Swiss-Prot record:
Compositionally biased tracts (Basic and acidic residues): 128-144
CDD domains reported in the protein's UniProt record: BAR_SNX33 (cd07669), SH3_SNX33 (cd11896)
Gene Ontology CC: one annotated term: plasma membrane
Membrane-spanning intervals of the chain: none
Identification of the protein by name: Sorting nexin-33
Sections of the chain in a coiled coil: none
Gene designation: snx33
Length: 550
């Protein structure tokens, strides 16, 4: 027998997968288990599709009705709310890192993602803890008005459950639904600078080297892996980490810092991962990744990162790893740790500033992609086409020298020797072209790859701010219409201000690093190009002198 439900509110579907509901309409449900707050069923007009679980009341065969909680499980509304604490046994214990499957590691992030969906999938249990669970309330009615009888309605929720604004929890933060934590020890200050808000500098800045990629084995050689020696200069105590350790840290960072553009880890490679070229490429990119991490005022002070860089004791490592995985100030809750400056900022000005950066980041992303494509093609020609052409030229000169020897009385040994040397010189120049990309083009491509990753994060981060702006406008409109208390609208505006300051601070840091990184990258590229062409010129000059001596 199909389950029945009654529509508590009217709902207008926005795509072909969603159906319309009318208030008090009788519905047939395919299941009473919701998926991300949505149910599937059939309305009185025979249309089958999705609709919000919070908009309906399920008719139970027993006395009373059934409502659906946020985790998607049907529950009698008369049951007391679950108050259990997080069950440690539910958490997968991966303390023995050497036994992890080498194939299970980070994958490339899709364009325009800061990893929110990845974090959601891999760490969903953090959001489903009882202390984070909130049964979805109707988008057109305020939760406190149901209990207290106050007039008015809350700002409508975004029903697109795939929106990063919803998934990240920032919508819940802006609407005041993220629980406060008493006695929060963690805090991150934002201060005003001449160019706008910026993260307060790390009072103990440091750098960390990435050196000595070494192939190691375990299980009597059955499994192999590469370890890297990391040496922070504030301790000068080296630690050794595998790529999967970086992967674990990266996932912690994704889970915690929703409004920060995280540098992407270099790609995972299943085959050829022990080849020297790949090992050196990954090392170069880990160096850039580490440099970006240590230069960021917030990321560099993250306890999980400090633990990653400094812990050498196995027991302490396990304790710190678990502590990082149980961190409650993650996602939208991280915004609770921010301390804002007292200076006033008009939200209209902030919105315009964000729009300017959005256009800038889009154009820069296109430019970086184009430059990366051109440099990659040039490197490919160095390795193949240029090398081959110079070898052909050298062989042609060698052929000419051999032909001059066919009539001995007129062969002129000095000239034959000079022509033969010319051929060998051009063959050597071809090898020089093939070796050159590792000195300049590959390193330049590493920087471009880093910024492709950073830029791909910003569309989702900007979307969070745009969503917050929309909630402010909605709340003020509802306050003007008398459907929301002004103090509630002010609260939405205040929390939107937090998101705005965080985004501007991140934009400020991005520009600071961009100016430094591209200055250094292009300087290095040009210097190496000059050295290269000087070497080519020197080889040609030596060959030229042979003809002067004839």
């Amino acid at each position: 027998m199909a389950l029945k439900a009654r529509a508590l509110y009217s709902f207008q579907g926005e795509n072909k997968e969603e159906i319309n509901l009318m208030e008090n309409e009788e519905l047939q449900l395919l299941s009473d288990v919701s998926l991300d707050g949505w149910l599937q069923g059939t309305n009185s007009r025979g249309q089958t599709g999705l609709f919000p679980a919070s908009y309906v009341e399920i008719q139970s065969s027993r006395s009373g009705s059934v409502q659906v909680d946020y985790s998607g499980n049907a529950r009698e509304y008369t049951d007391p709310p679950h108050q259990g604490s997080y069950d440690d046994d539910d958490e997968e214990d991966d303390d023995d890192w050497d036994d992890w499957d080498d194939g299970q590691t980070v994958v490339d992030e899709p364009s325009g993602s800061n990893g929110v969906s990845r974090s959601e999938l891999q760490h969903h249990h953090h959001y489903s803890r009882p202390e984070y669970s909130h049964r979805p309330r109707p988008a057109l009615e305020r939760q406190d008005s149901i209990a207290s009888g106050k007039r008015g309605s809350v700002v409508g929720r975004n029903l697109n459950r795939f929106s990063s604004f919803v998934r990240s929890g920032v919508e819940a933060f802006v609407l005041g639904d993220v629980p406060q934590f008493g006695g929060v020890a963690e805090s991150h200050a934002i201060e005003m600078a001449p160019k706008g808000p910026q993260w307060k500098a790390n009072p103990r800045p440091f750098n960390c080297s990435v050196e000595e990629p070494t192939k190691q084995t375990k299980f009597k050689g059955i499994k192999s892996y590469i370890s890297y020696r990391l040496t922070p200069d504030h301790s000068n105590s080296p630690v050794y980490r595998r790529y999967k350790h970086f992967d674990w840290l990266y996932n912690r960072l994704l889970h915690k810092f929703t409004v920060i553009s995280l540098p992407h880890l270099p790609e995972k490679q299943a085959t050829g991962r022990f080849e020297e070229d790949f090992i050196q490429k990954r090392k170069r990119r880990l160096v850039l990744w580490m440099d970006h991490m240590t230069s960021h005022p917030v990321l560099s002070q993250y306890d999980g990162f400090q633990h990653f860089l400094g812990c050498q004791d196995e027991k302490q490592w396990k304790a710190g790893k678990r502590r990082a995985e149980r961190d409650e100030l993650v996602g939208a809750s991280f915004l609770l740790t921010l301390q804002l400056p007292t200076e006033h900022q008009d939200l209209q000005d902030v919105e315009e500033r964000v729009d300017v950066f959005k256009a800038f980041s889009k154009k820069m992303d296109e430019s970086v992609l184009q430059l990366s494509s051109v440099v990659s093609e040039l490197a490919r020609k160095h390795l193949g086409g240029f090398r081959k052409e110079f070898q052909k030229l050298g062989a042609a000169f060698q052929g000419l020298s051999h032909s001059f020897q066919l009539d001995p009385p007129y062969s002129s040994e000095p000239l034959v020797g000079a022509i033969s040397h010319t051929g060998r010189t051009y063959e050597a120049v071809g090898e020089m072209f093939a070796e050159q990309p590792k000195n300049d083009q590959f390193r330049f491509l590493d920087t471009l790859s880093l910024y492709q990753g950073l830029l791909s994060n910003f569309p989702d981060i900007i979307h969070l701010q745009k969503g917050a702006f929309a909630k402010v406008k909605d709340s003020q409109r509802m306050s003007d219409e008398g459907r929301m208390e002004q103090d509630e609208a002010d609260g939405v505006r205040k929390r939107c201000r937090v998101v705005g300051f965080a985004l501007q601070a991140e934009i400020n840091h991005f520009h600071q690093r961009r100016l430094l990184d591209f200055k250094q990258a292009i300087q290095h590229y040009l210097k190496e190009q000059i050295i290269f062409y000087r070497r080519v010129s020197q080889e040609l000059e030596k060959t030229l002198h042979l003809y002067d001596e004839l």
